[in-house]
Amino acid sequence: MSITRERKSELISEYCLKKDDTGSSFVQCAILSERIRNLTEHLKVHKKDFHCRRGLMVLVCRRRNVLQYVRKKYGDSEYLALIKRLGIRDIFH
């Protein structure tokens, strides 16, 4: 259910804004999206895992807050480019 260290470093290198950028909002969204995908796959098999379902909702809310910050700080163009790269739906338009 959690992502491996190698996968996390791949996401960081793919979404970083500059070298050694591990905490930018783009990287945070990418890592949260990967964790959400993993939990979604887990819940397809284990339908009654309500503890996991609650954790998934927490991650979705956290990603939504980070996406709101990206949209506010960087503008609609960067926000739309990020959600297109992540392959998720637009929640604001």
From Swiss-Prot:
Signal peptide: none annotated. GO terms for biological process: translation. GO terms for cellular component: cytosolic small ribosomal subunit. It holds the Pfam family Ribosomal_S15. It comes from the Bacteria. Keywords: Ribonucleoprotein, Ribosomal protein, RNA-binding, rRNA-binding. GO terms for molecular function: rRNA binding; structural constituent of ribosome. SMART domains: Ribosomal_S15. CDD domains: Ribosomal_S15p_S13e. InterPro entries: Ribosomal_uS15, Ribosomal_uS15_bac-type, uS15_NS1_RNA-bd_sf. One of the primary rRNA binding proteins, it binds directly to 16S rRNA where it helps nucleate assembly of the platform of the 30S subunit by binding and bridging several RNA helices of the 16S rRNA. Forms an intersubunit bridge (bridge B4) with the 23S rRNA of the 50S subunit in the ribosome. Belongs to the universal ribosomal protein uS15 family. Part of the 30S ribosomal subunit. Forms a bridge to the 50S subunit in the 70S ribosome, contacting the 23S rRNA. This is Small ribosomal subunit protein uS15. It comes from Ehrlichia chaffeensis (strain ATCC CRL-10679 / Arkansas). The gene is rpsO.
